[in-house]
Regions:
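Tryptophan-paired
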Residues: 26-71, 223-276
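Compositionally biased low-complexity segments at domain edges in trafficked proteins
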Residues: 92-203, 284-336
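Long, low-hydrophobicity ectodomains and other hydrophilic envelope-associated domains
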Residues: 183-254
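Structured domain cores in non-transmembrane regions
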Residues: 32-117, 129, 201-206, 210, ...
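Sec-type signal peptide cleavage vicinity
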Residues: 1-39, 43, 58-59, 64, ...
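Short, surface-exposed linear segments at secondary-structure transitions and domain or protein termini
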Residues: 48-49, 86-96, 233-240, 278-288
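A structural detector for beta-sheet-dominated domains
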Residues: 12-16, 25, 70, 83-87, ...
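Edge beta-strands of extracellular beta-sandwich domains
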Residues: 76-83, 268-280
């Protein structure tokens, strides 16, 4: 009997900044199917939530990990041994999230996600959805580890925050790790040690508030097409038609960057962008309370927008608006 091919996924390993890079001694990703999977070769890279690099595809359904690593900036070895919540994993493995509101051959209304299993891959012409594609590990100071599930380029969801344990008896690990290094442990410590290293900033980014984004404008011809959220906790969310017109309230982290696309007529398509300070925006959400409304109010001339939190002005670090040309279903340019 021909063996069933296991679904593929990529693994990413990242750190908050280049000051907090780590190196691995050993690693194993456990799968529901029982086959082995592993981390990419080398140390962490990229930014919080995104490594910026790929590796050999892994196979199966990830359900846990056993990882031993070295944080040079703390001169400490850690072990992360964790089981992921199985019911949650099974649920998310069945989901395929919408990536684009473009003009695919599928004429059905989009949904945030459908239960399509593991083999959906986004295609601008044929398929709006993407199944689980990347398992992302983020390593912060003091053994803080966050794991995300990524679906294509548009959606990234935090699976959980975990705590690695300090390994005190580490001489054998030191021998193994530094055997082929050009520097020894003392030299790495002298170069990288940071007594102020703390996970607090990245723990703070995980704070959530119950709120909903709303896009409004006085132009009766306003059509909304897409809204992309990049949160400080590294999650990504995309809102498309039709639910962009009535985005549900749920617990969300503080936005780092948002962009949204609208039209008010033929050849009148615009994208607005806003960038936020975590400290200032978090203070505003603290005062706003639960079930808040984050409103983006487009000016009648489409050249700017204002931001309100529960009808009170909310200042962004910067905002931008410019014209664009993207194909969407229901566009005034009739791309269907």
């Amino acid at each position: 009997m021909k063996q069933k091919k296991l679904p593929e996924f990529q693994v990413e390993i990242c750190s908050p900044t280049n000051d907090y890079l780590i190196e691995f001694v050993s690693d194993k990703i456990f799968t529901l199917e029982g086959n082995g999977a592993s981390l990419p070769y080398g140390g962490t890279s990229g930014e919080w939530g995104y490594s910026g690099s790929g590796w050999t595809e892994q196979h199966g359904t990830p359900i846990g990990a056993d990882i031993t690593y070295y944080a040079g900036y703390e001169d400490t070895f850690y072990r992360l041994k964790v089981d992921f919540p199985l019911d949650k994993i099974k649920d998310y493995m069945e989901r395929a999230y919408a990536q684009s509101g473009g003009t695919t051959e599928d004429k059905a209304s989009l949904e945030e996600y459908k239960r399509l299993g593991r083999n959906e891959r986004f295609s601008a012409n044929y398929n709006s959805y993407n199944s689980f594609s990347n398992l992302v590990f983020g390593f912060a100071p003091k053994g803080m580890v966050v794991v995300w599930l990524r679906y294509g380029m548009g959606v990234r969801i935090e699976l959980g925050r975990y705590q690695a344990e300090v390994i005190k008896e580490d001489k054998e690990l030191e021998k193994k790790l530094f055997a082929n290094w050009s520097m020894n442990r003392q030299e790495v410590r002298a170069r990288d040690f940071n007594p102020e290293a703390s996970p607090q900033e990245w723990d703070n980014y995980r704070i959530r508030y119950a709120y909903k984004p709303v896009i409004t404008g006085e132009n009766k011809a306003l059509r909304l097409f897409e809204m992309n959220y990049h949160y400080y906790n590294a999650e990504l969310e995309i809102m498309l038609r039709p639910w962009i017109n009535n985005i549900p309230i749920k617990k969300r982290a503080i936005p780092k960057e948002i962009s949204f696309v609208w039209e008010t007529g033929k050849d009148q398509q615009f994208v607005g962008r806003a960038y936020f300070s975590w400290e200032k925006t978090n203070e505003a959400f603290k005062k706003a309370g639960n079930n808040a409304k984050l409103e983006f109010k487009i000016a009648p001339d489409n050249n700017s927008f204002e931001i309100f939190l529960n009808d009170q002005p909310l200042k962004a670090d910067s905002t931008r608006v410019f014209k664009t040309e993207s194909e969407y279903k229901d566009s005034y340019n009739n791309y269907n």
